[in-house]
């Protein structure tokens, strides 16, 4: 085989479509749509450079979404779980309803760490896209400045038909969200500046319930993050002092959505006419992603520990 023919064969292999082993019993069915996350990560050890990857997290199954396996209990799992991920994927990378790039990534033979399960190595010479500058806002449990994670999909389904955008809650909606927060945390304990190690009951006020972020859609749905200010205790905060998210229906019904997370992006990733929302899990010794769909009535969770 000539060198030119070899190069052509390599090019065909490199840009091949998704290599994906379907679960038993579904061979011959339509290939699922996959959602991954283009990540920026600090090196595993001091002095190691940052690295980029695409973490394979969700796939369509029937009329819903399911997560890929993620939470390995032991080292043996790390050596075998890679077989449950697609061998190679061509990704369309998106942000805010627009395509921002394309990458190709491959699953390694095994994963070395619990926190790297699902991470594929980016191949090729094209630099993966970035949005903005590195920030600790995206660093999660490790707390180092990294580039914003971006949603990657195997189909060009990146548009956001519901047009989710930052917003300000009305006075009435803010009051309803605060009522829901207080219903979730009727009793809170706190420390004092004079004693940061011992807690006692703390009658927090409305002003302590800060609406930190809020987003709205053209279908008149809202989501809001509430953070309780005024915590004085030393060490990891109690649940009430962590990020709490609520969803508000067009009828102004408020429901708890989740905690210790932040919104990565929204898009109609399965092309059903409605947007899915992807959140990043940001908790102590815990990371991953949550995908909400069907008007927040259903979700899929990809979750891992760091040690």
Question: What do these predicted regions represent?
Answer:
Residues 12-22:
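Bacterial N-terminal signal peptides
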Residues 2-12:
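Bacterial N-terminal signal peptides that target proteins for export
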Residues 29-307:
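Beta-propeller-forming repeat regions
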Residues 1-2, 18:
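Low-complexity intrinsically disordered segments
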Residues 23-28:
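Sec/Tat signal peptide C-region and signal peptidase I cleavage site
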């Amino acid at each position: 085989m000539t060198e030119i023919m070899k190069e052509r064969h390599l090019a065909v292999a490199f840009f091949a479509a998704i290599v994906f082993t379907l679960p038993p019993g579904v061979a011959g069915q339509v290939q699922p749509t996959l959602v991954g996350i283009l990540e920026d990560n600090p090196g595993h050890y001091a002095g190691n450079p940052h690295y980029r990857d695409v973490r394979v997290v969700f796939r369509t199954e029937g009329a819903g979404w399911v997560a890929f396996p993620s939470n390995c209990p032991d080292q043996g799992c790390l050596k075998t779980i890679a077989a449950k991920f697609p061998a190679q994927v061509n990704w369309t990378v998106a942000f805010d309803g627009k395509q921002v790039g394309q990458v190709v990534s491959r699953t390694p033979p095994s994963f070395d760490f619990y926190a790297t399960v699902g991470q594929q190595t980016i191949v090729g010479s094209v630099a993966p896209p970035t949005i903005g500058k590195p920030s600790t806002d995206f660093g999660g449990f490790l707390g180092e400045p990294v580039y914003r994670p971006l949603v990657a999909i195997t189909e060009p389904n990146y548009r956001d038909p519901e047009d989710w955008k930052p917003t300000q809650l009305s006075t009435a909606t803010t009051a309803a969200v605060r009522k829901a927060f207080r219903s979730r945390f009727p009793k809170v304990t706190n420390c004092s500046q004079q004693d940061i190690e011992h807690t006692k009951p703390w009658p927090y006020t409305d002003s302590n319930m800060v609406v930190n972020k809020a987003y709205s859609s053209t279908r008149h749905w809202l989501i809001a993050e509430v953070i309780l200010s005024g915590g004085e205790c030393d060490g990891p905060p109690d649940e009430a002092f962590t990020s709490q998210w609520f969803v508000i229906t067009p009828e102004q019904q408020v429901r708890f959505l989740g905690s210790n997370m932040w919104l990565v992006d929204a898009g109609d990733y399965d092309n059903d006419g409605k947007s899915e929302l992807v959140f990043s899990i940001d908790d102590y010794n815990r990371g991953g992603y949550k995908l909400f769909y069907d008007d927040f009535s259903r979700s899929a969770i990809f979750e891992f520990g760091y040690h």
